[in-house]
Amino acid sequence: LEKLKPLFYQTFEKYCNDRNYMNLCWDEVIKNYSNKKRFYHNLNHLQHMFNELQEVEDFIESIDSVRLAVFYHDLIYKVTSTENEEQSSEAFEKRISKTRFEHVDLVKEMIIATKFHDKTLNSDSRYFLDSDLAVLGSSSSQYDEYTRLIRKEYQIYPTFLYRRGRLKVLRALLNKPIYQTDYFTSKYEKQAQRNLKRELQTLV
């Protein structure tokens, strides 16, 4: 939190002079990402993404767009919904409409792109999407912890249903290169492939 809050305000205050409104927006981010049902898609996930993006900031054209996309991409997150990305995108648009920020459509596209992580032509979007999947290329033990937290988020589903859904996700990820940028590909692709294949073997 001590890193996320100043980053949020530094970004927001470039486009908004109303401190009360900024407080309202920040409080919403905190409230949503701190929901007790979130075991992985929480503030730690945001911090992890920002840590990864810090290494590639020099290659990012609109850093504010990427930062806002990070803060808002999982704002709405319900495991029973298939519209989380669209709803998060709409929530972002609603909040940012009262500011002077101009790249609204770009950020909305970034948020919606996290649904399938399809290849995108926009360079900033690629770095953003790759940072969202950086966890897949973490060490075996960190990856196992990630899968444990994801399972906890989906604990309302019985094992056979969760397994079916998770297999679908893993196969989709393994069906194409996981990362879109040279930086993240060289850093994480091989390990991510290993992690995903290993998890796949435990589920089939």
Describe these PLM feature segments.
Residues E2-T11, S34-H41, N51-E61, Y72, ...:
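Divalent metal-dependent phosphate-bond-processing catalytic cores, especially two-metal-ion Mg2+/Mn2+ enzymes
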Residues K3-Y15, R19-W26:
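Hydrophobic, proline/glycine-rich low-complexity stretches
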Residues M22-I30, L43, I63, R67, ...:
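Short, well-structured alpha-helical segments
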Residues I30, F50-Q54, E93:
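Amphipathic, well-packed alpha-helical segments that form the structural scaffold of globular domains
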Residues N35-H48, Y77-E90:
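Active-site metal-coordination segments of metallo-dependent hydrolases
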Residues H41, I60-R67, T80-N84, T99-H103:
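Short, surface-exposed helix-loop/turn micro-motifs enriched in polar/charged residues
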Residues M49, I63-V79, S88, M110-K115:
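His-Asp-centered metal-binding catalytic motifs of divalent-metal-dependent phosphohydrolases/nucleases
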Residues S88-T120:
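Histidine- and acidic-residue-rich, metal-dependent catalytic cores
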